[in-house]
Amino acid sequence: MSPETRKHAGILIVIIPTVIYGGVSILNFLINDPAYMQNPLRQNLFRAGHAHAGVLLILSLVVLLYVDEANLSNGWKSVIKNFIPAAAIFLPAAFFFSVLKPDATKPNGFINLAYVGVALLVTGLLTLGIGLIRRKTN
């Protein structure tokens, strides 16, 4: 693993406790906030946001195991190292920020951040996949 990739991994590992904090926050809503239980849309989007944050953060770490093996320029490797973790921010942000009001009955405009996150994720994954396929065995 290159020093730059190792640094990215360290940053991502340091960020993982924020997802843990998010889970504790949702648990707190479930236990102490009766209004939270009255809004299934908010419950579902908060749950989706938390799940996407955790899964995409772990995926970002897994990807770092492969990125240095890809037959790509350093610029494209940077795209992978940055786009996939960025998706772990944009997708959950879309879910959380779109229903911040406890009485929300539909997602607000922030839900469109999900499309940005999806575009970043797909770009990063396709780039890595193509780079790995292009790699010739030694």
Summary of predicted features, one role per range:
Residues 1-36, 40-50, 54-138:
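Polytopic transmembrane helical bundles with strong interfacial aromatic enrichment
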